[in-house]
A protein has these predicted regions:
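Conserved metal-phosphate-binding beta-hairpin within the catalytic cores
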Residues: 111, 202-222
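Generic recognition of stable, solvent-exposed alpha-helical segments in well-folded globular domains
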Residues: 54, 58, 175, 179-182, ...
Length: 309
């Protein structure tokens, strides 16, 4: 299947993000379309990942439905997409999500259940994450005593900035900050248990919220390989990096080639593209309502080739 880098629908373009093109359906609703673009270190890469947008959209839809009892989200009451909108690009249907308009809260709500990524780097430097002191002697990928809420600014350009919960409260007000932390920790706890039932560890994840009708609701994407770290529970061995089903594979490659993390980003080689696509499809197979449409033998062979045991 040909990867999709850009879209062009007969609707007003509301915004274009790193991955999604968002169109205005009406004064109250938007259509979010997930492309195959991929970003790393806050920079969009020139090479698309086939099927990635479909995986992101299908997983987000499934998680939004499954967590609706915990927190309201931006899914529209009617999720059907007018036939005329996709008549020229019918392959976008599984990549499209109809949502209500909300006012974004411009902070990312990150929850870490395990110490990895930037959290591990912060701990090595200071013994803490987001200003919260952690026990000494932790190894990379260790499970934390309790999940930690580590918010970050949401930069329109450039790199996001990690901040402490206290700084979040200073910027948003104490009541809103407490609401964001409570909802984020509740969602993480639910999703971590659900992922483990599918053989995956939810190491950390990012939530985004907005205001709609005076309420705080979940927006953007939810518990996807773009916004989360998913590890294979059967192969979990703390003390170093873990085999994962997310875009860490791309980050690792970019670190290896010595990219300075400033645009333009280098192109990805074919083996990294296919390896990333395989990881995303495996996450969908395990977590989503319907897995990738390929025979199990083909999937297993591709998985063995790119995610060795």
């Amino acid at each position: 299947m040909t990867p999709i880098l850009t879209t062009s629908l007969p609707l007003p373009l509301h915004s274009q993000g790193k991955v999604r093109d968002t169109y205005r359906l009406s004064d109250r609703e938007l259509l979010m379309v997930a492309t195959d673009r991929i970003s790393a270190f806050d920079v969009v890469l020139p090479t698309p990942i086939p099927e990635k947008g479909r995986v992101l959209n299908q997983l987000s839809l499934a998680w939004f439905r499954e967590t609706a009892g915990l927190v309201r989200n931006h899914l529209a009451p009617d999720l059907s997409i007018p036939t005329s909108v996709l008549s020229e690009q019918p392959d976008l249907e599984q990549r499209s999500m109809r949502v209500v308009m909300a006012e974004p809260i411009l902070f990312e709500c990150v929850v870490r259940g395990y110490i990895s990524g930037s959290g591990w780097k912060d701990y090595q430097r200071s013994g803490s994450i987001a200003g919260e002191r952690l026990p000494g002697g932790l190894r990379e990928s260790d499970r934390l005593p309790e999940p930690v809420f580590t918010p970050a600014t949401k930069a329109t350009s450039g790199h996001d900035e990690n901040i402490s919960p206290a700084e979040l409260a200073h910027r948003t007000g104490r009541e809103l900050a407490q609401t964001l932390e409570r909802l984020s920790l509740s969602l993480y706890g639910f999703a971590a248990e659900r992922a483990l039932q599918s053989g995956l560890i939810l190491a950390d994840t990012k939530f985004e919220f907005g205001f709609h009708g005076g309420d705080v609701i979940l927006i953007d994407e939810l518990l996807t390989p773009d916004s989360s770290r998913f590890w294979d529970a059967q192969r979990y061995r703390p003390g170093g990096p873990q085999p994962s089903f997310d875009k860490q594979f791309v980050r690792d490659y970019l670190e290896q080639v010595g990219w300075n993390k400033q645009p333009p980003a280098p192109p990805l080689p074919d083996e990294v593209v296919e390896g990333t696509s395989v990881r995303y499809l495996e996450a969908l197979r395990r977590l989503g309502p319907a897995g990738p449409r390929e025979p199990r033998g083909v999937r297993s062979e591709r998985l063995r080739r790119h995610v060795p045991s």
